Amino acid sequence: MGKKWIVFFAYLLLSSFFISSSSAGITKESPLPIGQTLSSSNGFYELGFFNFNNSQNQYVGIWFKGIIPRVVVWVANREKPVTDSTANLAISNNGSLLLFNGKHGVAWSSGEALVSNGSRAELSDTGNLIVIDNFSGRTLWQSFDHLGDTMLPSSTLKYNLATGEKQVLSSWKSYTDPSVGDFVLQITPQVPTQVLVTKGSTPYYRSGPWAKTRFTGIPLMDDTFTGPVSVQQDTNGSGSLTYLNRNDRLQRTMLTSKGTQELSWHNGTDWVLNFVAPEHSCDYYGVCGPFGLCVKSVPPKCTCFKGFVPKLIEEWKRGNWTGGCVRRTELYCQGNSTGKYANVFHPVARIKPPDFYEFASFVNVEECQKSCLHNCSCLAFAYIDGIGCLMWNQDLMDAVQFSEGGELLSIRLARSELGGNKRKKAITASIVSLSLVVIIAFVAFCFWRYRVKHNADITTDASQVSWRNDLKPQDVPGLDFFDMHTIQTATNNFSISNKLGQGGFGPVYKGKLQDGKEIAVKRLSSSSGQGKEEFMNEIVLISKLQHKNLVRILGCCIEGEEKLLIYEFMLNNSLDTFLFDSRKRLEIDWPKRLDIIQGIARGIHYLHRDSHLKVIHRDLKVSNILLDEKMNPKISDFGLARMYQGTEYQDNTRRVVGTLGYMAPEYAWTGMFSEKSDIYSFGVLMLEIISGEKISRFSYGKEEKTLIAYAWESWCDTGGIDLLDKDVADSCRPLEVERCVQIGLLCVQHQPADRPNTLELLSMLTTTSDLPPPEQPTFVVHRRDDKSSSEDLITVNEMTKSVILGR
């Protein structure tokens, strides 16, 4: 009798084992309840219900089978645990996979499958949960398309700019809470791509650009390293990173709740950590700020690149380096200068390439360097094996210097920063004679300086009196006259740390007056070509333009050779700093972009029709649209004015000025300009705001289409909705987007007469009246990096000019 009971209990034990663990799939007739699991056929992975610390909250997940403690690699219901003991995972009538929380309904779903012939769910040998059509065998859904915090071999991170599809890793909130946490790991759509970890919208860590077999910011991945990843990018705006299994071991890559990326494998007993990042303090994004260099081998970890000094010296001394560095000697760049203001490149070895790089298709380092030298916006370049030429047109951010490995980065400096030193022996041997020469020279210099200053004071005083006398207060009511001392104090003596940017006429500085009012100071360079009459015209005429969508001039300063224009300060800088930044662009959703478009249109209408002067701007572009503290747009940079008698509405000039890509065809080719030239530029500006793409950088596929060409095809094919920046798709009204694309195309039509005037434009933007169909625009081919910068100014003397016509 005892033996029979033993046999009976053995039978029950074996039966319960086969019930609780099965390699069969989930079907409509055979759901997966709590207490039962589904295994992969190779026995490596298991799917089932689990909880933390014996909690009633149950999750459906996948884990490595037989490994203690359990390591969960995927969770279905991350945000919504089930609590009913009768919960189960089942196939629905339409073929989708559903998690039922007992009588509480559906807690999670794989989405609509719409399969009439039925489907089943299986766990593959790669740990991928797959829903399969019973009739065709087609995969209807898979967990690898909906990753959590872990990648398994054969899984993929990806992006597709055309469809907006993106596959990322998202961290858990904590070790025992699988809901979505603070960190996201993704590959960026840059060329070449890189791995980027963000905390919210803030960069936290990045791998550096991909170079055929390695990430350049990971020294471990040298030329001899065979990594566990494969990266693909194509010209259609899609890319992927696939995790490979090169040794048949159990392995995983994971984004932890603390934001670290960990690669590990199982040796049969324990998990072995192969790679973790960020690990060193230099791995954290931007720890040394713009133009700061984080050195891994020596303390203190942050230093400035050669030719740069700390921006906030006291903070720097305290170990707060995030303010970064600024140039010690300002660059004077005219493309290919060879004089005393010529620029040179200083090479820095063993560098993790900084962020915000741009790829340029040059075949050797010489061409790469030459192109960067001729592009005044290019601040640095690197020619990297497996990539080719990279250039930097923005601040060098998140640069790291390794003890070994890394890349050679060449940084643009003023020639004076690389001046050589005398040899110590030569200095010692000639110290007496040199001292004598210095003393004699100093005495001579003092005498000469006295004579020059004496004569200059007379000339300068007379010049200042003449200029100030010519500038009558009644001509410029409300305009303030500032003395040089006030402006020098406000701008910290034109400190480079106060520099906001470089315009066609000279640098622009931020200043703060004694009453606390912030200002922007345009310091007109002596080489800008401005004469007395032109300068007076700008002050007298532009000061009379008052509109909420125009930057307002507050005053001027004339002392000696200095000519300064003082404008109201714009807190949020220019529109391009938001629109073309992968993170800041999220701050301007579709409603805000539409407000900006309408505000710019109102400003142009005022210039063309509502002011007592008729003003044709001739250089409307995204960098000339400034944003105030409420993100209201203001048109800026009118440049030098020129007055015409009468009421002309068009003119012709031999001095074609403006920015390539924004200029109307008739203006660029013949010099003929009118208010319709500004309308064309506004149309280009609209397409940039809608798409989030630069007119000078956009390309689509192998055909190198312009943004205008792509917008035209988009409007013809889909009404223009697929032109929209995917980052703002959730906040848009599709009909508004399609209408704006059509208006933009109406503005860039080839014939000026076909383009709307500003009154018609405002009506189009603020009503729902019917729009005429646009004619196919001229697809002007834009120049790439091999010849020019991102913004090519077409001008005789490199000035950005507006034209002011009397009514």
Swiss-Prot record:
Cytoplasmic side: 448-807
Reactions mediated catalytically: L-seryl-[protein] + ATP = O-phospho-L-seryl-[protein] + ADP + H(+); L-threonyl-[protein] + ATP = O-phospho-L-threonyl-[protein] + ADP + H(+)
Protein name: G-type lectin S-receptor-like serine/threonine-protein kinase At1g61420
Membrane topology: Single-pass type I membrane protein
Residues that bear Phosphoserine: 528, 543, 623, 636, 696, 790
One example of a Gene Ontology biological process annotation: recognition of pollen
GO terms assigned for molecular function: ATP binding; calmodulin binding; carbohydrate binding; protein serine kinase activity; protein serine/threonine kinase activity; ubiquitin protein ligase binding
Keyword set includes ATP-binding: yes
Positions bearing Phosphothreonine: 653
Gene3D superfamilies found in the cross-reference section: Bulb-type lectin domain, Phosphorylase Kinase, domain 1, Transferase(Phosphotransferase) domain 1
Region entry CaM-binding, spans: 583-600
Residue ranges constituting the Bulb-type lectin domain according to the UniProt record: 25-144
Transmembrane feature ranges: 427-447
Primary localization: membrane
Organism: Arabidopsis thaliana
InterPro entries: Bulb-type_lectin_dom, Bulb-type_lectin_dom_sf, Kinase-like_dom_sf, Pan_app, Prot_kinase_dom, S-locus_recpt_kinase_C, S_locus_glycoprot_dom, Ser-Thr/Tyr_kinase_cat_dom
Entry keyword Protein transport: no
Active site: 619
